[in-house]
């Protein structure tokens, strides 16, 4: 149940390339050859729209074409529960990224900017099914779990060869979910019911499962800060957990017995804060503590069932 990106040789979600292509086709007919004054006018209207959305804290019908891009420059302490994989060089802590929000005719491609782990990878492609005054229902596609590549960790990231040698690569888990969002005055609750697919198991069969992901986020504005307090609970079905921390017959060695994992839960508490530095730059900081079911420690691949992630960085918004 590891949420890990190989910091030197990252594991990318190639399954979303086609989503980007769809958006390029959808918006290719839109002309960007406008006058400078019109571009400034358009940017101003988007800023006003974003401000209205923030103040209302209500569902926004994503009918018009709107976009926003941001460059992320973050230092992230990102431990995982898998033994033998650690950040041991300064470069491993630096995680730049591109965050983007695009919407048109109910379709959207977005990052969850209420959470610190959005900076660790949380792009969502979706469509609004129902939009009411205080709630909405969407269908989304996203990566729910990051994979890990033991061979790459050993070669590029100083992974522990004794613990990782002989393990198969674990791919990203992709999911298509029905998401319910309930808006309150200063908070938001979301619930995802996701059908997922991961890589192949030791028998070359695609691993499929279910993830039920819930999260509550409360916004506390303080002076010029946006401070978010969050808590979440996630259920992972047995097939998914076994794919990540189980040990197949082809992976057994003297210190690593065969192991079949059970389904499990992950609880999270989170603090995330944003502070504008200028019209384009903002400071971001977050800390997330994750606690997994105690039975995950029975896996020969796992040395702890709880991790704490810390992030400090700045964003440049176009």
Each PLM stretch: what is its role?
Residues 106-110, 135-137, 186-191, 224-227, ...:
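Repeated loop/turn-to-beta-strand initiation elements of outer-membrane beta-barrel proteins
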Residues 77-96, 112-114, 151-168, 298:
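Surface-exposed strand-loop-strand hairpins of Gram-negative outer-membrane beta-barrel proteins
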Residues 88, 269-318:
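Predominantly the C-terminal beta-signal and adjacent terminal strand-loop region
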Residues 71-77, 111-113, 139-145, 191-197, ...:
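Transmembrane beta-barrel strands of outer-membrane/channel proteins
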Residues 113-213, 217, 221, 242-257:
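Outer-membrane pore/translocation modules
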Residues 65-67, 92-98, 103, 133, ...:
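Residues that define the transmembrane beta-barrel architecture of outer-membrane proteins
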Residues 73-75, 98-104, 125-127, 176-182, ...:
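Residues on the lipid-exposed face of transmembrane beta-strands in outer-membrane beta-barrel proteins
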Residues 34-110:
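Short glycine/proline- and aromatic-enriched beta-strand/turn motifs that initiate or cap beta-hairpins
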């Amino acid at each position: 149940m590891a949420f890990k990106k190989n910091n030197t040789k990252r594991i990318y979600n190639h399954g979303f390339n086609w989503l980007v292509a769809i958006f390029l086709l959808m918006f290719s007919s839109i002309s960007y050859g406008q006058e400078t004054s019109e571009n400034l006018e358009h940017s101003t209207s988007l800023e006003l729209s974003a401000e209205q959305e923030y103040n209302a804290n209500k569902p926004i019908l994503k009918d018009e074409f709107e976009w926003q891009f941001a460059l992320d420059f973050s230092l992230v302490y990102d431990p995982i529960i898998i033994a033998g994989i650690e950040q041991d060089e300064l470069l491993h802590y630096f995680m730049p990224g591109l965050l983007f929000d695009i919407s048109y005719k109910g379709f959207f491609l977005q990052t969850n900017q209420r959470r610190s782990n959005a900076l660790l990878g949380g792009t969502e492609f979706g469509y609004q099914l129902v939009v009411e005054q205080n709630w909405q229902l969407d269908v989304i596609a996203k990566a729910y779990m990051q994979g890990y590549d033991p061979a790459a960790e050993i070669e590029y990231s100083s992974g522990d060869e004794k613990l990782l040698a002989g393990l198969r690569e674990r791919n990203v888990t992709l999911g298509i979910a029905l998401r319910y969002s309930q808006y309150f005055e200063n908070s938001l609750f979301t619930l995802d019911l996701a059908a997922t697919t991961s890589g192949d198991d030791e028998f070359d069969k695609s691993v499929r499962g279910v993830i039920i992901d819930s999260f509550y986020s409360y916004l506390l504005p303080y002076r010029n800060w946006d401070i978010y307090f969050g808590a979440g609970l996630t259920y992972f079905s047995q097939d998914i957990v076994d794919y990540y921390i189980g040990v197949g017959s082809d992976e057994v060695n003297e210190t690593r017995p065969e192991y079949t994992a059970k389904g499990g839960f992950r609880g999270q508490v989170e603090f995330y804060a944003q502070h504008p530095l200028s019209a384009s730059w903002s400071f971001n900081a977050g800390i997330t503590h994750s606690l997994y079911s105690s039975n995950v420690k029975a896996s020969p691949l796992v040395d702890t069932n709880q991790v704490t992630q810390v992030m400090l960085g700045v964003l440049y918004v176009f």
